[in-house]
Amino acid sequence: GNSVLAPWVRHQFPEVGRIIGELRDTPCGKKECEYCSSEHDPVQELKRYFGHDEFRRDSDGRSRQHDVALAGMRGENVLAVLATGGGKSIGYQLPALNRYHRNGSLTIIVSPLQSLMKDQVDGLIASNVQCAAALSGLLTLPERADVLEKIQMGDIGVLLVSPEQFRNNTFRRALRQRQVGAWIFDEAHCLSKWGNDFRPDYLYASRFISEYHRDQPLAPIGCFTATAKPDVLADIRAHFQDTLGITFKEFIGSHERVNLRFEVVPCQKSEKRQRTQQLLEDNLVTQEGGAVVFVSSRKGAEELSEFLVGKGWACKYFHAGLPP
């Protein structure tokens, strides 16, 4: 396992954690300091972990992605609304990796969907990041046991979990062995009763966080979403103010997607399959590439896939009911 502070050391000698924080987590302010110019510079860390020379810029020329990552590295509570495709995940992944490298702490990322968790872990591994894992129903019992052991041994620095995991006693015990450096809520609109994807267990997570930090300073909280109306944002702010007594540094980006073109084509329900077939022929027959067709139900996905296969298209359906 990696060298991380044992729980008894943190509880018996709290000054140790404070001293480590002063040494490794607080910039000294000297330009000539090699450590600070590397460990506290988001651009340097972006290059180290993801191989990019600069952060993505918004249509107004700013880089909210950079600003969000910097706030996370500084240990601030962050509420970020960044459009889909705007590099939202780097806003919390980069500080998480930086945090793990600096002090060995664990970042918990709460995510609502198993597929999203798997995609993030696969993406990090593809970037040669080996300290990321997910706890989800896609794991076998031996795989789950392996992840829990790695959490306790300090081998994992970025852990993605569903909110339901906070009710699991084995998981709770494993977390007690580690110092949690930040709690991140991806798809944070799931916290709001005004959101279409409200998940009650998202609200329970903050209760667990309060219990976890009962005898120690509260770790930073981050809330990230691509779609949040004003009433949803108000709900998120109120929830964390009421349960944890915190306020956020906010980064509210534009929802404008200049790289996308939208077209609305009215048609009858009975015409949708033929219309889908026609759109595919119009756009894919003469050029390479693929298409994603969204439907409103699992049955609809399976039936449309069967129809398109019958028309000669290489097509597969995907939904949450598929086995691992």
For every predicted segment, state its role.
Residues 1-13:
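Charged, low-complexity intrinsically disordered regions
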